[in-house]
Amino acid sequence: PTMAANSNEKTVAFTALTEDGTGTFTVDVANLNIKKPGMYYYTVTETPRNTAGVDYAAKSMIMVITAGYADDGEDSSLSYWAALHDSTNYNDKNSKFENTYTAGSLKVTKKVTGSLGDKDKKFNVDVTFTAPAGKTVKSTITYVNNGAESIAPDAWKLNTTTNQYEAKVTVELAHKGSVQFNNIPKDVTYIVEEQDYSREEYTATYEGDKSGTIANDVKSTTITNNKGDDNIDTGVILDNAPYILMLAVVA
């Protein structure tokens, strides 16, 4: 890139990646204290942030500032030209700091079994996400449950016991229902826990990954609620046949 021809603002724009796409940063040449003609070399590195799911560029770049007189010295003001080189490939002048964001998904499915299981009943399921230690979540997790829902970055709260950020949501699921959480940053951990329905004589079992760590894939768990197999008062099975009640009347 070349420096803007504005003597009052000596800045050079370079390409850089952010979690939102492509961005730029500026270098104020005036702050480099270049007073004489010549070529000046600077090492430019990126300082990693603490955004969950992001791998930051580890390489450095070489910034070359050339200071000289554009009019063979007749004008006493120095002009500046800038170039940014990849430190591993000096001929590459189009390099950038490239950060990689990786996310995964979590799918929770509900099944209801047993002769007394209510397949229309909605069960409350708590899902708790925990950010990696020292990290914050800046992306929005989306899911659909009774309409489009999301977990925004400001929904994450610091757990003062673990010193990690957490976000917790409750979803409703009936038989054969499911919910999938998308755009969960990698290395975020999760726990799926259905609320207690033992007083209603439901027994919950989990299949798959009830808890785990998000990666670049889809984690899944199925919660099965069973009721009734051991509570049937066995006897004559009526099915849908008429039930005839006989009364003996004693005169």
Could you describe each region identified by the protein language model?
Residues P1-A251:
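Solvent-exposed loop/turn and edge beta-strand elements of beta-rich ligand-binding domains
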